[in-house]
């Protein structure tokens, strides 16, 4: 299993020439993704300048608002606010309804009425569907799934374990 190459529409944080690339396939309603979020945030901060982080949606829970949370993040992305919205959605602890999604959008400076309209009209549904299909084509069947420099991370998402894997990847890259 390999992640697909990073493309223009991916959600990327960090320098393109970073020696490390960490890709997360995740879902805003997955309890394991919610638990992993603060660990990944601390790792991103610890490796600032050395790490390029990519988040890819894999809405899988089947809950009513599962895909809608991903759509809300895409609405935010269209306005340059993906990462703040990403944090807001994980802060909701996997519990989303339309009003919570709109509130999250306003918390990051987005227009409530525009967000509500985009979600009700499913303006970003096709984008989320395409991302889900791409993840399936890459062999992703569960969340969270992580790759460090293209190699699947197979351990628990705990800070010391993840940092050890990152350090090994850094050493292997010669950085």
Please provide the spans of the model-predicted regions.
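A short beta-strand-turn-helix
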Residues: 3-20
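Short clusters of hydrophobic/aromatic residues that line enzyme substrate/ligand-binding pockets
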Residues: 12-13, 96, 153
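Generic hydrophobic-segment detector
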Residues: 4, 62-63, 70, 125, ...
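C-terminal cap of thioredoxin/glutaredoxin-like
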Residues: 25-26, 32-44, 103-175
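N-terminal targeting signals for export/organelle localization
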Residues: 1-4, 175
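Structural alpha/beta surface segment adjacent to cysteine/selenocysteine redox centers
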Residues: 18, 23-106, 111, 116, ...
């Amino acid at each position: 299993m390999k992640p697909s190459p990073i493309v223009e529409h991916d959600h990327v944080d960090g320098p393109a020439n970073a020696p490390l690339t960490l890709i997360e396939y995740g879902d805003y309603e997955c309890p394991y993704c919610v638990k992993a979020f603060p660990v990944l945030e601390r790792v991103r901060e610890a490796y600032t300048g050395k790490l390029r982080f990519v988040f890819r949606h894999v809405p899988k829970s089947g809950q009513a608002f599962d895909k809608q949370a991903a759509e809300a993040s895409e609405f935010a992305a269209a306005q340059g606010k993906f990462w703040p919205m990403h944090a807001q959605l994980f802060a909701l602890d996997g519990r989303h309804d339309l009003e919570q999604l709109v509130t999250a959008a306003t918390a990051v400076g987005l227009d409530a009425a525009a967000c509500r309209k985009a979600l009700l009209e499913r303006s970003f549904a096709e984008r989320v569907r395409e991302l889900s299909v791409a993840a399936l084509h890459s062999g992703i069947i569960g969340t969270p799934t992580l790759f460090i420099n293209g190699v699947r991370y197979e351990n628990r998402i705990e800070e010391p374990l993840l940092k050890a894997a990152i350090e090994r990847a850094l050493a292997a890259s010669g950085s």
